[in-house]
Amino acid sequence: FMDCSYEGDLMAHAGVSYTVGREDNSVYGETYNGVQMMQGHQFSEPIDPYVIPGDSTSGLIWGIGQDVLQPAGTGDKKIQAYNFRVCLTDDPNNMIPITRPDNYDSTRYELVLRLQAASPRKSVYNYFIWSRMPNSKTDINNRGGISTDMIGMNWDYPEADYDRRAEIWKAHEDYTKGLFYFLGHDERVPEFMRTEILKWGYPKDEYVDNNHWTHQLYVREARRMIGDLVMTEHHCVGKEVVDDVIGWAAYTMDSHNCDRIVVRGEVKNEGNCLLYTSPSPRD
């Protein structure tokens, strides 16, 4: 059989060896595995992480984890963030307004306000990769320090049961819908941004059997098989080449952030890694 799912449930139940998370760099002699504190999709400005700015006793604002930054390359069980690739439309004849979603909580987006105050964006689109598609629609993806990625909220997903996965899935949906609602309706968001986002809505003719919302959570990573050969960065950069190719990959080495933590009193994302490579045979 072939297990072509994101999760690899059949693979696991069949007793195939696998791993979850990030190997330590020492396992395969790599450089870009494990903990990575890079500049991509990062908070480049100092952002206070505490509910009451400057007061660590007030607790952390939503979306920031308790873990302490480990040395670069340290392995763990964290996985890169999931999100939804969002389809919206600005065609008024095909648009359903973005309404307040289930479980909406504006405190989840405090980081947006603090980032905007520290480094004002000139457009709401600066918070996303906002790719226009045919028929006045979009393919929206994560961008920057805070966006559609729900960083650190998916670690249980790969080996969770179906009920727990459904909870994680729903939390991602609520967060993402809430982000768009927040940007369009919270009066603390600059008026020009609210005006921009309110031009958009869910397309009437997409995902009609799922309330016009995509059926698929972007499960970027889950279980990974440990076979006779394990593909590592050495294959991706061309230092190792296989002679029994079964497939081709044509994208960069890419990991989204895995955690959001406090480093020296500031909010930082951890785990992003983007290494440009040439298309090459990947086993």
Q: Could you say what each language-model-derived stretch is?
A:
Residues 279-283:
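A short, hydrophobic C-terminal helix/tail in secreted or cell-surface proteins
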Residues 4-278:
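Flavin (FAD/FMN)-binding glycine-rich loop and adjacent Rossmann-like elements that form
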